[in-house]
Swiss-Prot record:
Region (Disordered): 141-161
Transmembrane parts of this sequence: 22-42, 43-63, 89-109, 110-130
Source organism of this protein record: Mycobacterium tuberculosis (strain ATCC 25618 / H37Rv)
Protein name from the UniProt record: Uncharacterized protein Rv1303
Note: Was identified as a high-confidence drug target.
Taxonomy of the source species: Bacteria, Bacillati, Actinomycetota, Actinomycetes, Mycobacteriales
Membrane topology: Multi-pass membrane protein
Amino acid sequence: MTTPAQDAPLVFPSVAFRPVRLFFINVGLAAVAMLVAGVFGHLTVGMFLGLGLLLGLLNALLVRRSAESITAKEHPLKRSMALNSASRLAIITILGLIIAYIFRPAGLGVVFGLAFFQVLLVATTALPVLKKLRTATEEPVATYSSNGQTGGSEGRSASDD
């Protein structure tokens, strides 16, 4: 059975999106990619894959910044968010494709880095949210009456009402 949206626990983005942790994961993955690519004689592919990971992180940071600025307005518009997203994605995609074209075939690592970052972002965002949701459903929920006392009749007499 699914939980209705109004009953779902609120999960703040700060719980899910941790850019510093993502940065260190990206650096580690870029180092591994460079090591593996270097073993096969294509060190630049690993470097470009790392660049793609960093471009993906830049995109995620820009998403957070634009979402914060747009939702801070009194009447945020979906149109401004959509326009901002489309222009940002277009710029990063064009930049990635230009790098891939100029430095081909090794530059294609940028495109793979961007794609891999999206998978990484979903994984590192979804896992903490799922963990938070799981712990929220395991904790007992206290109910309060109109006089501010917790629900249940344990330890109370009938005259307490």
